[in-house]
Regions:
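A conserved regulatory-domain signal marking ACT and ACT-like small-molecule sensing domains
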Residues: 1-84
């Protein structure tokens, strides 16, 4: 369900391969989510831990659909989300 005026944070575990992060961020872009912050730690054992916070009020799709599309990105291992 679309939350008016809310900020969502998505924590993702990615394979440390070229293009995975940009493909993940493209999903946010295509959904018209306004990205506020991106944090990524140095990859460990081939896995990168990324946190993305975005405003969700103007998204063109529901949050559940966004999460589904993020998980479909090749190289995404795990996703957790917090809608605040």
């Amino acid at each position: 369900k679309k939350e008016t005026g809310s900020i969502m944070t998505v924590q993702v575990v990615l394979n440390d391969k070229p293009g995975v992060l940009v493909n993940l961020l493209t999903v946010f872009y295509k959904a018209n989510a306004n990205i506020l912050t991106i944090n990524q730690n140095i990859p460990v054992k081939g896995k990168a831990f990324v946190s993305v916070s975005a405003r969700s009020e103007n998204m063109s799709i529901e949050i559940d659909e966004l999460l589904k599309r993020l998980f479909e990105v090749q190289g995404v291992i795990k996703i957790d989300s917090i809608v605040g």
